[in-house]
């Protein structure tokens, strides 16, 4: 009995000290919500969509605030200046990831590109980044077009048969194939059903891994309760084992057929050659990175694109008309049979995208309103430091609130409305300001060249003053428009390039940005060009995201109608 009483009192004392520790205010620390509870800290404030909870907290406590996520002090950044300070200026102090148990399991001891520490991360990044340059991505345009062909012909069959089309598995088959070909030259056959073969072998484990990593695992933040999650973590290990075995088979095949005298044909070859086959586990884990993250981020963004153009038919028609006017001479249909085979009419590159500014704006707006990695991947402070005057102790977890940056009404006008036109207006304003700056620079150069001629110099000065006055008036007009009916707007208000960073920023940003942009453009352009896309039941599709490490739309069916592009 005395043992139970002693244990009870020890628990009470521990909880009391934990309560005091978490609620003690430190000098120069960021603003903090009032009550952090023992063990769980502020986790009770986050709900089932932490991205939205962090957005609301940022409105109350500002662009940098501190919370306790269980036992981990955490600083959340929802301000471009703070993000730039941590992700770019103080990069070396914030290079590493937190060592949570679930991340340890997934990365086999932090031995992959996503979660490894410096300097291993730096070595891996240098190796793989060469595979994602603009020229390399341009070189795989045939692969992207081929996979898009498969998708649009599948959709055409649904259109012909007037059946509801659930896009998720088919889109993810496309993006998975692209990643598999680039990473290890393996293709899921076009005639292979999405519920069979490699798709079936990979899809479910991939979904389970993403769900586990994105579920804000309680035992990650409160290690004391980890034994209670033994069975859940064991199932996670078993799921990871399935994926590792799949990649290991491919790895063994690469070793068997590797030609050291020829250039590497894919990322796995590149890693094997660069490490002399001495880091098998790291190679396998890095390829799992590409398999899971590389396919799902793009695939889910395409899903969101279809949701928003379905819910906004006027915008969809404007996209189609733009594409039709630009590419209607492309012969993309083979009418030799009743089930006309479609081929991609639109590829990737400046020669295509330069003709479709409105479609480009639609894709950017999807990335703004639904950045699929809504909270990015966390970092940790390696040493004590200050961020714009706020003290950040060593070991503090840092979260980049990507969703909050692009969806806060303190940073952007009407953030919850899908409005591609905002990007067109923004580009016009940027172009106008750049032209004025160039004009000023030219005038200054002319002044320097003609200083010996007093009369010409005076004329130049008068012209310069006039240009400066016009420039200031234009800026004042723009500021007045932006500040109508509101006070104290953020200095980056409606500065879309500053607040919309769906691929993150800095040296540890997404390595596959070029590939992702190419996939998004080719797929979205060809789908809108070939089909009218609506919700199956005629109702608006739910735009509320399901939270995870990747935020995705709820399951839905689409009505696909083939367009007549002749």
Swiss-Prot record:
It is found in: Membrane. Its EC number is 1.14.-.-. SUPFAM superfamilies: Cytochrome P450 (SSF48264). The chain crosses the membrane at residues 1-21. InterPro entries: Cyt_P450, Cyt_P450_CS, Cyt_P450_E_grp-I, Cyt_P450_sf. It is a single-pass membrane protein. Its main location: membrane. Residues 471-491 are annotated as: Disordered. Heme binds at residue 510. The keyword Phosphoprotein does not apply. Disulfide bonds: none annotated. GO terms for molecular function: heme binding; iron ion binding; monooxygenase activity; oxidoreductase activity, acting on paired donors, with incorporation or reduction of molecular oxygen. Residues 472-487 have a biased composition (Low complexity). Keywords: Heme, Iron, Membrane, Metal-binding, Monooxygenase, Oxidoreductase, Transmembrane, Transmembrane helix. The keyword Oxidoreductase applies. One of its GO terms (cellular component) is membrane. Pfam families: p450 (PF00067). PROSITE patterns: CYTOCHROME_P450. Its cofactor is heme. PANTHER family: CYTOCHROME P450 307A1-RELATED, HEME-BINDING MONOOXYGENASE FAMILY. Belongs to the cytochrome P450 family. This is Probable cytochrome P450 519D1.
């Amino acid at each position: 009995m005395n043992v139970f009483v002693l244990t009870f009192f020890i628990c009470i004392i521990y909880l009391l000290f934990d309560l005091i520790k978490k609620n003690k205010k430190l000098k120069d620390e960021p603003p903090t919500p009032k009550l952090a509870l023992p063990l769980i800290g502020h986790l009770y404030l986050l709900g089932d969509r932490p991205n939205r909870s962090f957005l609301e907290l940022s409105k109350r406590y500002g662009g940098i605030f501190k919370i306790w996520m269980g036992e981990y002090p955490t600083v959340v950044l929802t301000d471009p200046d703070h993000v730039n300070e941590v992700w770019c200026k103080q990069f070396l102090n914030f290079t590493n990831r937190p060592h949570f148990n679930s991340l340890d399991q997934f990365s086999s001891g932090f031995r992959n590109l996503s979660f490894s520490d410096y300097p291993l991360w730096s070595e891996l990044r240098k190796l793989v980044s060469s595979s994602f340059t603009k020229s390399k991505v341009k070189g795989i345009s045939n692969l992207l077009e081929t996979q898009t062909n498969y998708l649009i012909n599948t959709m055409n069959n649904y259109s012909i048969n007037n059946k509801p089309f659930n896009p998720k598995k088919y889109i993810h088959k496309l993006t998975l194939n692209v990643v598999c070909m680039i990473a290890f030259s393996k293709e899921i056959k076009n005639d292979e059903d999405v519920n069979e073969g490699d798709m079936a072998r990979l899809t479910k484990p991939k979904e389970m891994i993403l769900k586990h990593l994105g579920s804000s695992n309680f035992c990650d933040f409160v290690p004391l309760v980890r034994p209670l999650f033994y069975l859940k973590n064991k199932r996670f290990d078993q799921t990871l084992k399935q994926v590792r075995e799949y990649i290991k088979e491919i790895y063994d095949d690469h070793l068997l057929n590797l030609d050291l005298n020829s250039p590497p044909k894919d990322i796995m070859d590149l890693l094997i050659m660069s490490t002399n086959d001495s880091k098998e586990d790291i190679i396998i884990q890095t390829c799992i990175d590409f398999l899971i993250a590389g396919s799902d981020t793009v695939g889910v963004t395409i899903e969101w694109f279809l949701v928003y153009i379905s819910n906004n038919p006027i915008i969809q028609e404007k996209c189609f008309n733009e594409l039709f006017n630009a590419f209607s001479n492309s012969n993309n249909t083979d009418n030799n049979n009743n089930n006309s085979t479609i081929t991609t009419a639109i590829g990737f590159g400046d020669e295509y995208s330069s003709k479709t500014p409105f479609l480009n704006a639609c894709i950017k707006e999807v990335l703004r309103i639904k950045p699929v990695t809504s909270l990015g991947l966390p970092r940790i402070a390696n040493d004590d430091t200050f961020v714009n005057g706020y003290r950040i102790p060593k070991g503090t977890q840092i979260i980049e609130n990507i969703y909050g940056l692009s969806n806060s009404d303190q940073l952007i006008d009407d953030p919850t409305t899908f409005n591609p036109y905002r990007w067109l207006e923004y580009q016009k304003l940027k172009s106008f300001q750049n032209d004025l700056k160039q004009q000023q620079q030219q005038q200054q150069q002319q002044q320097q060249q003609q200083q010996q001629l007093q009369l010409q110099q005076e004329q130049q000065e008068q012209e310069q003053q006039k240009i400066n006055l016009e420039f200031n008036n234009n800026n004042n007009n723009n500021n007045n428009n932006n500040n109508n009916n509101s006070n104290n707007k953020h200095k980056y208000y409606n500065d879309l390039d500053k607040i919309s960073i769906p691929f993150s920023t800095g040296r540890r940003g997404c390595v596959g940005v070029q590939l992702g942009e190419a996939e998004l453009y080719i797929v979205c352009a060809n789908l809108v060009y070939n089909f009218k896309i609506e919700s199956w039941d005629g109702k608006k599709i739910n735009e509320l995201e399901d939270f995870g490490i990747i935020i995705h739309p709820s399951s839905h069916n689409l009505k696909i109608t083939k367009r007549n592009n002749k």
